[in-house]
Amino acid sequence: LADAVENCRCAIHMAGSGMPGVFLAFNRKVILGTRASKVRTTSFHAFESINYPYVGEINSRGLDIRRSYIPGPKGSCVLERRLEEKVFLIKLVPGFDGKIFQFLYEQGYRGLIIEAFGMGGIPSMSSEIMDDLRDVIQKGMIVVVKSQCPYEGCNLSLYETGRTALDAGVFQARDMSTEAVVTKVMWILGKHWERKKIEEMFYKNLAGEISPQEEDMFYKGV
């Protein structure tokens, strides 16, 4: 069995709708590109929309587009080619050694995404992980913490370990997917902005990658 024909048909219908944006058409569903993530290797429902509704679906009437979930254009289309390739992704495991942060900094990495535990917890008791993390941030590295759980996002202000990380200067991914965070950091660092501008743009909803209420939490200081 193959689903290529059905996926192509769905993609063509979406392209013909005139809706702006980047989308993924798969298994009779359309996913906003900034929310798409591959979660299975062989199943027909291999892709899911992370923390966001599907923006389209094939039913008996054809392609049903949920226009209210599609972000409107914010200007003319511009092809961005300046991406920072020195961005690294780490998943925390028990026994993790924070010295890897310094190693990555010495190798020229400018951005680091850490997939932490639960709500975004980074072990800080009886370890030097937080000191190592704070050191590379002070040297200019941009560090983002997100949950290893793909759904429901992270809130570092909820527990002490998360608040300690925030005090060290990390950004939190809120409800963004891993793919969206990595891409966003590469794009932002390619701009060579100052840290204040980088932080502002990281928490700004650019293409539907972060939920509006999550964006509001940042600006309200929650």
Regions from the PLM with identified roles:
Residues 1-28, 32-37:
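Short, glycine-/small-residue-rich phosphate/pyrophosphate-handling segment
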Residues 2-6, 50, 99, 107, ...:
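Conserved active-site and cofactor/substrate-binding residues in soluble primary-metabolism enzymes
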Residues 4-9, 40-41, 160-164:
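Short, hinge-like loop/turn segments at secondary-structure boundaries
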Residues 14-15, 104, 136:
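Hydrophobic helix-cap positions at the C-terminus of alpha-helices
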Residues 17-21, 26-27, 52, 83-87, ...:
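Short coil/turn connectors at secondary-structure junctions
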Residues 23-27, 91, 115, 146-147:
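Short beta-strand segments
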Residues 32-119, 124-126, 205-222:
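Accessory alpha-helical/coil subdomains and C-terminal extensions
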Residues 119-222:
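C-terminal non-catalytic interaction/assembly regions of soluble proteins
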